[in-house]
Each structure stands twice: as C-alpha cells, then as structure tokens.
Amino acid sequence: MAVGKNKRLSKGKKGLKKKVIDPFTKKEWFDIKAPSTFENRAVGKTLINRSTGLKNAADGLKGRVVEVCLADLQGSEDHSSRKVKLRVDEVQGKNLLTNFHGIDFTTDKLRSLVRKWQSLVEANVTVKTSDDYVLRIFAIAFTKRQANQIRKTTYAQSSKLREVRKKMIEIMQREVSNCTLAQLTSKLIPEVIGREIEKSTQTILPLQNIHIRKVKLLKQPKFDLGSLLALHGEGSTEEKGKKVSAGFKDVVLETV
C-alpha cells in the first residue's frame, strides 16, 4: 500500500468566498473650499486613494474640477438655475483650494426661456482678463413686446439682430477685459453684464431674459500660489525677514 498524502482528502471545500475588503479603507477624504467671492466657502468633500510609496494623493487632486449649484454657494434659491465649475489648484493639509473654472445654466432653465413668437439673439466672444485668463463668454437674449403693441409676434429684422449682437459683443469685451477673474465672478453672480446689455440696446430693440449663458475657461496663466491664497483670504505664504539696524555687530566670545 502506498504511503503518502491523500490529495483528495486534503482539498478544501470548493466555492469558498474570498475575504471582502472595504475599498473605502484605502481612501481619504478632503474638504473642498470655494474662493472668498462666494458666500459659502464649504463646498463639500471628495475622496482619493491614500498616498503610498512614490504616489502622492495631492498629485491626483490638483486639476480636479467639481460642479456646484450656485444656490448652495450663495445660500439663496434665486440662483438655483446656475452651475459653477471650480478647479482644485492647491492642497493644504486636508483642504483643497479651488479657483473659478466656468459657469453654465441648467438644461431645464435654458429650455424654459425659448418660446414661440419671439426672436432669439445669441453672441459669444473670446476675451482675456486683466490677469491673463482667456475666457469665452456666451450671451443670450430674447425680443419682447413693446408698450401698446397689438401684433402677437415680436420677431425682429435681421439687421436689428446684427446691431444687437454687435452691441452685446462690445459690452462683454469691455466688461471682461477691464477686470480680474475674481472681479468677473462678482459681476456674474448678480447679472451685472446682462443689465448693462439691456440698457444699451433699448434704442435698438426691447429685450428680455438677457443672461450670460455660459463662461468657459480656455487658457490660464502660470500658477501663482500667492494670488490663490489672497483669493481665499489667507494672505501670502512668503516669509519676510526683519531689517537689521546699521550699527549691529556680531558678538565675539573671548572664552568658550
């Protein structure tokens, strides 16, 4: 009789389940901070795999773009139809410092503006801000009925629409090129540019529902940590030494 190990008896049961490992144990959470131009700076949280070996978690977070409802950032439901994109530029401990990356309308709001019996005017322009951000601005407007108008429709002539579109582009170029990105964000929230377009085009055509529909970031300047910290109200991280008086002399010890 052969003496040895019985392979059939030593085999374990088939179909044993593997040990389930929770994937969240390998991840860590970070707080997203919005720029100080918004009312609420606490945007939310995001997660990423923990730093292991040469792989740093901060490298995977930089450049990440998050989309937030403007109503949450401003604490008002009046802005619920707008979405803001924020880009992570710096990681400080567990905080992610973000910068403005774009703004857009929600689909349902945009669809609700388009109606029958009126003309649609759209314009877009590529502008550089005073701090060298290249943006593409999209504006939208609709014709409205004049006072004491009997006719049902408010269609406009093509020549009038071209004049309005030209005026819209001029105003967008003027308003954007003379301000920084942070100042532009402050203008976009209360619809300052839309009201300026409405005032300037009254002599050409009466308009309604004038909005900056979308702002898209095309190019950004070289990253500057000091300006980002100033945008978040945290000051500069540069260490400055104290000025030494002219009569200062090193103390020489006679004995050690």
From Swiss-Prot:
Main location: cytoplasm
Keyword Ribonucleoprotein (UniProt): yes
A Pfam family matched in the record: Ribosomal_S3Ae
UniProt modified residues of type N-acetylalanine: A2
Gene Ontology molecular function: any one: structural constituent of ribosome
Subunit structure: Component of the small ribosomal subunit. Mature ribosomes consist of a small (40S) and a large (60S) subunit. The 40S subunit contains about 33 different proteins and 1 molecule of RNA (18S). The 60S subunit contains about 49 different proteins and 3 molecules of RNA (25S, 5.8S and 5S).
PANTHER family: 40S RIBOSOMAL PROTEIN S3A (PTHR11830)
Protein name: Small ribosomal subunit protein eS1A
Organism from which the protein derives: Debaryomyces hansenii (strain ATCC 36239 / CBS 767 / BCRC 21394 / JCM 1990 / NBRC 0083 / IGC 2968)
Gene responsible for this protein: RPS1A
